[in-house]
Amino acid sequence: MQLSIRMQAVADMVTPGGKVADVGTDHGYVPIYLIEQNKAFHAIAMDVRKGPLARAGENIVRFGCSGRIETRLSDGLERLEPNEADTVIIAGMGGLLTVRILEAGLEVLK
């Protein structure tokens, strides 16, 4: 999996070996890359829109990551439980939306 320079920079910041939640996953490429590179042993790909989440699911299957990446329809962090992820990725969104997601998900992030 080849990532864009921007998404590669995001993936490079992930501490290896944990569980990753990708908020606003869109195509699912970052969690797929992290699984392929063994930087994560499990990932949750989340998106608020059904269409992008369906495409992410198709990509997850196509790249052979079905057993290690699950998809969730979620507005921000609302479908993530405490301790389900060591790392949360929120990338490609505006600052105000990112702040709203973080504020709404404070209990999950503690």
Regions found by a protein language model. Give the residues of each.
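Conserved class I S-adenosyl-L-methionine
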Residues: 17-26
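Conserved SAM/SAH-binding beta-strand->alpha-helix loop
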Residues: 49-51
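Glycine-rich SAM-binding Motif I of class I
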Residues: 28, 32
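Short SAM/SAH-binding signature in class I
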Residues: 85-92
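A short, conserved alpha-helix within the catalytic core of class I
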Residues: 96-105
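Conserved alpha-helix/loop element of class I SAM-dependent methyltransferases that forms part
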Residues: 2-18
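S-adenosyl-L-methionine
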Residues: 54-83
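Conserved SAM-binding motif I beta-strand of class I
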Residues: 42-47
